[in-house]
Amino acid sequence: MAKAGKRIEKAREGIDRKKTYGLDEAVKMVKDRASVKFDETIEVAIALGVDPRHADQMVRGVVALPSGSGRTVRVAVFAKGDKADQARAAGADIVGDDDLAEIVQSGKIDFDRCIATPDMMPLVGRLGKVLGPRGLMPNPKVGTVTPDVAEAVKAAKGGAVEFRVEKAGIIHAGVGKASFSEDQILVNIRALIDAVQKAKPTGAKGTYIKRIAISSTMGPGVKVEPQSVAASA
């Protein structure tokens, strides 16, 4: 525990917690401080000027990260017949209908993304209490309820990341790994911010993107000047 405390203190050296940095500089600082033995995830936190308790201020979407996510994503697909075959051919890890529903109902959630064909939604809808709290409920708005299951599986496997604003008005998303180059992380962050901008709800008033911070899994956060994201693109 003492070692962890010392490592965190050392990682914070050179970071002014009151200052906001340009995106390029912030990414370099975070990468330089990712020093633990595993390949840390680079994470972005975006504070938005919305109140997600109101339906017209909800923000959610999906973004295809140009550099990929660096994660091995396990994908489950609810489909039958030819659609099930297409999902398997595209690389889905688990494919089924009633049998998959039974697995989910038992609480055995061994996947990171859940996709369904539209005709499966009456079945999947009954699993909302299990899938919903885990952020796994298929939704047409983010492309996880679709007749084109093959494309959805490929997108999920290839680095598509879902984002959704939380109760406090903040979006958290992983945008790569510490082993990525700075350029790979930068293009992923810009893609995420662009997708969040495009998902701006009609009910949003005033400043939309209020604050941005980036960090590695075990590292300190670095505040980013929001204008620098567009300026450095």
From Swiss-Prot:
Q: Coiled-coil segments, which residues?
A: none
The record ties this protein, via Gene3D superfamilies, to: 3.30.190.20, 3.40.50.790
- Name any GO cellular component annotation: cytosolic large ribosomal subunit
Q: GO MF annotations for this entry? A: rRNA binding; structural constituent of ribosome; tRNA binding
Q: Which keywords does this Swiss-Prot/TrEMBL entry list?
A: Repressor, Ribonucleoprotein, Ribosomal protein, RNA-binding, rRNA-binding, Translation regulation, tRNA-binding
User: GO terms for biological process?
Assistant: regulation of translation; translation
User: InterPro entries, per this entry?
Assistant: Ribosom_uL1_bac-type (IPR005878), Ribosomal_uL1 (IPR002143), Ribosomal_uL1-like (IPR023674), Ribosomal_uL1/biogenesis (IPR028364), Ribosomal_uL1_3-a/b-sand (IPR016095), Ribosomal_uL1_CS (IPR023673)
Q: Which NCBIfam families match?
A: rplA_bact
Job description of the protein: Binds directly to 23S rRNA. The L1 stalk is quite mobile in the ribosome, and is involved in E site tRNA release.
How it assembles, according to the record, is: Part of the 50S ribosomal subunit.
Give the family per the record: Belongs to the universal ribosomal protein uL1 family.
Protein name per Swiss-Prot or TrEMBL: Large ribosomal subunit protein uL1
Q: Which organism is it from?
A: Parvibaculum lavamentivorans (strain DS-1 / DSM 13023 / NCIMB 13966)
